[in-house]
Amino acid sequence: MAKAKFERNKPHVNVGTIGHVDHGKTTLTAAISHVLAKTYGGEAKDFSQIDNAPEERERGITINTSHIEYDTPTRHYAHVDCPGHADYVKNMITGAAQMDGAILVVASTDGPMPQTREHILLSRQVGVPFIIVFMNKCDMVDDAELLELVEMEVRELLSEYDFPGDDLPVIQGSALKALEGEPEWEAKIIELAAALDSYIPEPERDIDKPFLMPIEDVFSISGRGTVVTGRVERGIVRVGDEVEIVGIRATTKTTCTGVEMFRKLLDEGRAGENCGILLRGTKRDDVERGQVLSKPGSINPHTTFESEVYVLSKEEGGRHTPFFKGYRPQFYFRTTDVTGTIELPEGVEMVMPGDNIKMKVTLICPIAMDEGLRFAIREGGRTVGAGVVAKIFA
């Protein structure tokens, strides 16, 4: 088969491996890299390159992550793999590697284990939309009934956390045997790649989403009016569009009468661009940093939500001591700090540095938010935690 020429115009999808320690996540990552490079072209990464994950810092948190890329005939994938359980927790909560879908690796010799459950729960909390299961080490299980039982168990576990356990793809394979080049097991990797292609829908691009820009600064320009500046997070704003100012105070509507970038006037501002937006009839005091400019009706302000939080360890520059209920830190959303109070889950008295925990947060003023929004927890400007909005209450 002729190698397909690598082209950048294929849809780009972000995926990653999750699952219990030693169930074969990194071996599977290497197997996918090898088999797809051999079949469709591209560069193969071996186990040691992936396992030796470089250290990254995301919002001051140290995370070890390996990034590899591979291609199928129709798509280009970026794939993340983490060496340790703590790295997964941090990665998923900070959104350092946003996943459009995850490959849950379960060793068929063990079945679901504690971290299998924890990674599924985390995926649910942080909004990983799709999960595909790879049952690994199937070459070591002779009994077909046993494999069937493990598959049922995994499907039930996924259903428990509101994933469609009965309908999602489960591939039974052996990452190690595929990596060693045995054709029947290589075929299972191709099957997994086909499942990624068909089961995970093409992600919506930022530019196609409704317009939103966090406001970083506000200026008054004599004779022209008020300009707000920031980096457009998603969508497009055009001159003449009606926009809403959301968060901190009551929501107001206004019209974009101008877009400028580097002192040049433009017709529109697009996702990823830093621009200034001129607002009709808006006074300098009507807007402040921390609010967002958005397409009307696309986002609402909220104060109370459930979150999944990672608390920085002392080594990461976090707190040296635990915190208790009644803790009142600042929650940093996009461009601003807002004070909030926390409620810990029943039976939890204190939270130690290095823990991850589910907590209910009530802010003193509303912030424009959707489920999946990331935030930092700060004390006097120092980051002590990272979190994600899992569920909005009010």
From Swiss-Prot:
Domain of life: Bacteria
GO molecular function terms listed in the Swiss-Prot or TrEMBL record: GTP binding; GTPase activity; guanosine tetraphosphate binding; translation elongation factor activity
Ligand binding (GTP): 19-26, 81-85, 136-139
EC number assigned by the record: 3.6.5.3
Compartments (UniProt record): Cytoplasm
G4 as annotated region, ranges: 136-139
tr-type G domain: residues covered: 10-204
Binding residues for Mg(2+): 26
InterPro entries, sorted: EF-Tu_GTP-bd, EF-Tu_GTPase, EFTu-like_2, EFTU_2, G_TR_CS, P-loop_NTPase, Small_GTP-bd, T_Tr_GTP-bd_dom
Record's keyword annotation contains Hydrolase: yes
Subunit structure: Monomer.
Family stated for the protein in its record: Belongs to the TRAFAC class translation factor GTPase superfamily. Classic translation factor GTPase family. EF-Tu/EF-1A subfamily.
Protein name stated in the entry: Elongation factor Tu
